């Protein structure tokens, strides 16, 4: 089978490890979104950085190919619900912040939909296999949910959480059903 290739990191670490303000901001984000470690923040920052880098490159590119790439970038950002403006510009891409990407994670959406009481509980439900998207079990809390799949987030049908009488189910979900 051969040796698997060495996978490259999907994130960049901070340049300086002990900047108090950055540590404080990361702790607040970690608590707000129920993240388990700083690496999850760094992965999303890197993803945001690539979008912004591409937008900066496209601002200076006035060719037809640059126009096509800008339309593709807007398509990706619209598909994931990160940038929802119809008449978005590349300046709007540059003004995106980390929270706009963190809001599209499966863990955050499970909590926002009321399927879990806290972001940490949402993470636990996802990791333990209680959450499905379009009927398919997703066990990665960092899964970026496209807009078309957002309404299809639910409990797995064969999960104990699917039972209305389960003690861990939230009151808002019991009332909705």
From Swiss-Prot:
Subunit annotation: Part of the 30S ribosomal subunit. Contacts protein S5. The interaction surface between S4 and S5 is involved in control of translational fidelity.
One BP term from GO: ribosomal small subunit biogenesis
Record InterPro entries: Ribosomal_uS4 (IPR022801), Ribosomal_uS4_arc (IPR022802), Ribosomal_uS4_CS (IPR018079), Ribosomal_uS4_euk/arc (IPR005710), Ribosomal_uS4_N (IPR001912), S4_RNA-bd (IPR002942), S4_RNA-bd_sf (IPR036986)
Annotated GO CC locations: small ribosomal subunit
Keyword Membrane included in the entry's annotation: no
Record GO terms (molecular function): rRNA binding; structural constituent of ribosome
Stated name of the protein: Small ribosomal subunit protein uS4
Domain annotation S4 RNA-binding: ranges: 104-168
Gene name as annotated: rps4
Summary of the function given for this chain in its UniProt record: One of the primary rRNA binding proteins, it binds directly to 16S rRNA where it nucleates assembly of the body of the 30S subunit.
SUPFAM superfamilies, sorted: Alpha-L RNA-binding motif
Keywords, comma-separated and alphabetical: Ribonucleoprotein, Ribosomal protein, RNA-binding, rRNA-binding
Basic and acidic residues biased stretches: 165-177
């Amino acid at each position: 089978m051969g040796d698997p290739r060495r996978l490259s990191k999907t994130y960049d670490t901070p340049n300086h490890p002990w900047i108090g303000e950055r540590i404080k901001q990361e702790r607040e984000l970690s608590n707000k979104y129920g993240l388990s470690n700083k690496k999850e923040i760094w992965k999303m920052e890197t993803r945001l950085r690539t979008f912004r880098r591409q937008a900066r490159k496209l601002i200076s590119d006035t060719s037809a190919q640059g126009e096509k790439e800008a339309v593709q970038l807007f398509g990706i950002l619209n598909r994931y619900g990160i940038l929802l403006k119809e008449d978005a510009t590349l300046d709007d891409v540059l003004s995106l912040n980390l929270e706009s990407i963190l809001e599209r994670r499966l863990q955050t959406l499970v909590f926002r939909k009321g399927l879990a009481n806290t972001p940490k509980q949402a993470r636990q439900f996802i990791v333990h296999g209680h959450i499905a998207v379009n009927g398919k079990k997703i066990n990665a809390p960092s899964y970026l949910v496209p807009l078309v799949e957002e309404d299809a987030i639910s409990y797995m049908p064969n999960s104990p959480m699917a039972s209305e009488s389960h003690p861990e189910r939230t009151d808002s979900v019991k009332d909705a059903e």
